[in-house]
Amino acid sequence: MTYKIGVVGDKDSVSPFRLFGFDVQHGTTKTEIRKTIDEMAKNEYGVIYITEQCANLVPETIERYKGQLTPAIILIPSHQGTLGIGLEEIQNSVEKAVGQNIL
């Protein structure tokens, strides 16, 4: 099975991902972002990149997919910079897998 890769965020931050062949969706409101993530999850997206700012608006939606194999939801910084929550999520995952923070 081939999975698709999607990107969700504000237009300025995510439009460049089209160059890599990713499916880019713009969203700025909770409703738009939640609906986009749910649609991507239903439509066989293996990875969804989402800007930290958008993820901050829908933490319950992000949390709902954490326990599932797909989609993997990866937080990325926006064009405005990072909030640090994406790196924190990676550190938590590594610590959970390895038993300590090696980053």
From Swiss-Prot:
The keyword Heme does not apply. This is V-type sodium ATPase subunit G. InterPro entries: ATPase_V1-cplx_f_g_su, ATPase_V1-cplx_fsu_bac/arc, ATPase_V1_fsu_sf. Belongs to the V-ATPase F subunit family. Involved in ATP-driven sodium extrusion. HAMAP family: ATP_synth_F_arch. One of its GO terms (biological process) is sodium ion transport. NCBIfam families: PRK01395.1. The keyword Transport applies. GO terms for molecular function: ATP binding; proton-transporting ATP synthase activity, rotational mechanism; proton-transporting ATPase activity, rotational mechanism. Keywords: Ion transport, Sodium, Sodium transport, Transport.
